[in-house]
């Protein structure tokens, strides 16, 4: 049965998180691995699709079939990746991550989840927003709302604070940077201005370390480790770990044995990096956050003295270098009471609660991050909606023809801040035909822009003379049609069925292995009490199970069949031992007299010991079963 809950999802570049409203408060949901964040990593290993931690864990040995940071390519219609011999768009890869999130949330809540609120960087353009919405639909969600990440974080911060205040949200994630300024008060969250850089994030700090290590190694040994995919993946993981360590330590040491091989043998990489060195390597990156921050303040017509609170969002804000820069720019120490990895997901859950009716008295007024307009004569960009306009919104403007007797106009829709249309992002184009022939400048063509609450754009053009109309909803990424989305949904569902079948087979195999252990324990501990013929039968059945376990092509049914046969033999042992124990107890009671309770046939006799071993075996098998299942997911 489907739940009426709406899931709040932070679909991140390096990690994702998801939350739901419980008892009036947003709560992070732990994933299938028991963790509060999920790596945004997808891989195929021998045809098996892995998502999250299992995918990240095998990246070094399988770099060619592992995809990370796909969010950086959302909305790029000419970008795809090859996995397991097939081409996938960024929307499809993101959908695989969202599908795992959906599955884990449903397992945690015990209900089907059909609806979601998904966050995006505030500076995402229309294509990227639509691509994110498409990914959610491919994964099987009804995407109720697309929310800007800094806005969501502010909601998580201000849920229990009714005071009026101006908040600056500094959001440095794995792949994007946003800064937003919001006015909070009386349950209203109004975004005043936003700015950012979609090509700046924690990955870039990692790359700075990677390049430093690779350059040092090449200078010493003449080998560029970046040319070897496996070596590069090891460098990437080591760089990320070093970055994290340097947030709490003054120096760290990187040690990668056998990173390369020469005719003289293997080579190791050993390098010490101090925090000072790391900060000097990334000084240009931190400087890139200054311009957007100052621009957001200018757009809001605020100075840093107008800011009451500063909130840090994104794991990359844990770097001391970043915190120092933020304090220098804003004149105050950032708040530390919001978990930078979880705030966005918690805010998304709050917005989901608003939509589902679980949260009252909250109003979200977000803005469009970039100006929207059309190309006019001379290739100029004519704005219809300025950046930082509160959404939803609608604007119209009258245009005319440039030539005599022109019967068709091409409407080209752009988003950006450059004065030349071609230097901005082309969102889409369509033609309006059937304009009655007339001298240039005579026809009146009304172009209307509409931006919904998700920040997704619809453009309509109407010839006022003839009444002819055309419109376009700007599509994201590859411009996925409903049919394409449905096809991808079916593909995702097919993978879900395959995953379920794989899980059932693994469970059947685990039970077969456990039945062998139970049988062997029983035989070892009760060899004297078990009939020789019955013992031979059990040993034969154990061999049958082990033979199936050695067969890589064995099916779930194969495992279940041999397990059932062995279990039946174990039941026969149980019957025999029970009868023997009953007879011993009767004999002891008949011959012991007043001291019978302490006689040799009491509860501590051989039958009792066997019963105790069986019970311990059951407990051991349950724990081992869970370990095997978890281990399989992690492989």
From Swiss-Prot:
Acts as a chaperone. Residues 588-611 have a biased composition (Gly residues). Belongs to the heat shock protein 70 family. Residues 522-536, 616-635 have a biased composition (Acidic residues). Residues 492-521 have a biased composition (Basic and acidic residues). The keyword Transmembrane does not apply. This is Chaperone protein DnaK. One of its GO terms (molecular function) is ATP binding.
